[in-house]
């Protein structure tokens, strides 16, 4: 793999030095989650082949699955037409991407009557994941 980081200069980072990232399951096309990366996170993700995000609340790098074991192995990285959103196609180890114990963080569906309905089951109780 090239050690050049010129490709990172093509990313349009926001005023906080971050870029939004969509994690999509490579095998199914399911959107798993949305998160943020800074330059170091994106570079290390590309170098290691494992998803590493930037936690805005903790102000540090977050290795997806470091506590849960539900790592994301990167299959492909793409950038959108404006160079300001990253799409990361991944293999979701363990089948759980969400801290709620679900496959996807997008488990609530809007209904015509103005309610959100949970449409995906909890695959594993979060207490059993993070204990």
Swiss-Prot record:
Its EC number is 3.5.4.19. Pfam families: PRA-CH (PF01502). It is found in: Cytoplasm. One of its GO terms (cellular component) is cytoplasm. Binds 1 Mg(2+) ion per subunit. It comes from the Bacteria. Pathway: Amino-acid biosynthesis; L-histidine biosynthesis; L-histidine from 5-phospho-alpha-D-ribose 1-diphosphate: step 3/9. Its main location: cytoplasm. Keywords: Amino-acid biosynthesis, Cytoplasm, Histidine biosynthesis, Hydrolase, Magnesium, Metal-binding, Zinc. It catalyses: 1-(5-phospho-beta-D-ribosyl)-5'-AMP + H2O = 1-(5-phospho-beta-D-ribosyl)-5-[(5-phospho-beta-D-ribosylamino)methylideneamino]imidazole-4-carboxamide. InterPro entries: PRA-CH, PRib_AMP_CycHydrolase_dom, PRib_AMP_CycHydrolase_sf. Zn(2+) binds at residues 81, 98, 105. Its cofactor is Mg(2+); Zn(2+). GO terms for biological process: L-histidine biosynthetic process. GO terms for molecular function: magnesium ion binding; phosphoribosyl-AMP cyclohydrolase activity; zinc ion binding. Belongs to the PRA-CH family. Catalyzes the hydrolysis of the adenine ring of phosphoribosyl-AMP. NCBIfam families: PRK00051.1. This is Phosphoribosyl-AMP cyclohydrolase. It comes from Azoarcus sp. (strain BH72). The lineage of its organism: Bacteria, Pseudomonadati, Pseudomonadota, Betaproteobacteria, Rhodocyclales. The gene is hisI.
